Amino acid sequence: MTKENICIVFGGKSAEHEVSILTAQNVLNAIDKDKYHVDIIYITNDGDWRKQNNITTEIKSTDELHLENGEALEISQLLKESSSGQPYDAVFPLLHGPNGEDGTIQGLFEVLDVPYVGNGVLSAASSMDKLVMKQLFEHRGLPQLPYISFLRSEYEKYEHNILKLVNDKLNYPVFVKPANLGSSIGISKCSNEVELKEGIKEAFQFDRKLVIEQGVNAREIEVAVLGNDYPEATWPGEVVKDVAFYDYKSKYKDGKVQLQIPADLDEDVQLTLRNMALEAFKATDCSGLVRADFFVTEDNQIYINETNAMPGFTAFSMYPKLWENMGLSYPELITKLIELAKERHQDKQKNKYKID
């Protein structure tokens, strides 16, 4: 059987660099190597692109994926053809954060006309920018918690007024978030104005724009969505925390988080969550995969928190686990995403790019 040619891209110039490498290790060890000829491209923290061809063995440590040595090649050379000498059937970007899931690298793949897994330019960019995402949800009529947003330059000029606005409009605790970052990096839970100032200072280290959201005493529920024009959603899962806040450290290092799949919710609430996840997917014109995150209060009030265009994708992450609960294994999910990438690219070929 002739193998399909796949290129996995990971690393990246982002604070989520190490998360991306961990994800790549998991995917490389699970992908069907009888079906796919797999090359990898590692993007260093400095932005250099380094390639390794034909991965056939188990990756036992993320250290094996730090391809720091070797010549940094031109991007167009790297993606022109696979090490088998044939064009790539699909590129699988496993990049998190800015320069990875914000539409920038998706734009590169579009220009090079390469099929790629996951969301397109618009959906990736709008899902990454928390303010734009919230505005799209609002337009779609999806319920959200109160929030405000402002720029670093505005805060430097109008700090007193902005702090007053937060105190007038929101109740503590509040969450301060960089607008364009994931994996809970740069996010702070603030219970008073002193903590608020520190949280703002922390968030502005990662982005020029931030969002401050009203805190709520609620369960954190997540739904996985898969597909292109006709997506499907899983039954919800719950993030059960042994910490006050589900931050980067508790997500990836401490093991203080457990996933309950499916979540213990009334069936009508679960159905509402599935439908809202599909609405959120459509609101940002997504394709491939999305994880929709919600808050559910004790009296079953539902608020959408965000969509994640490149959700955590290790074997133990919520997104693959939700699909595993639906009967789709991790290796099968990887194959399905590659098929969806090819399907979307084939559909794009129906477009006309010149007028006769």
From Swiss-Prot:
It catalyses: 2 D-alanine + ATP = D-alanyl-D-alanine + ADP + phosphate + H(+). Its EC number is 6.3.2.4. Its main location: cytoplasm. Keywords: ATP-binding, Cell shape, Cell wall biogenesis/degradation, Cytoplasm, Ligase, Magnesium, Manganese, Metal-binding, Nucleotide-binding, Peptidoglycan synthesis. GO terms for cellular component: cytosol. Mg(2+) 1 binds at D293, E306. GO terms for molecular function: ATP binding; D-alanine-D-alanine ligase activity; metal ion binding. GO terms for biological process: cell wall organization; peptidoglycan biosynthetic process; regulation of cell shape. ATP binds at residues 167-222. Residues 134-339 form the ATP-grasp domain. HAMAP family: Dala_Dala_lig. Belongs to the D-alanine--D-alanine ligase family. This is D-alanine--D-alanine ligase. It comes from Staphylococcus aureus (strain MRSA252). The gene is ddl.
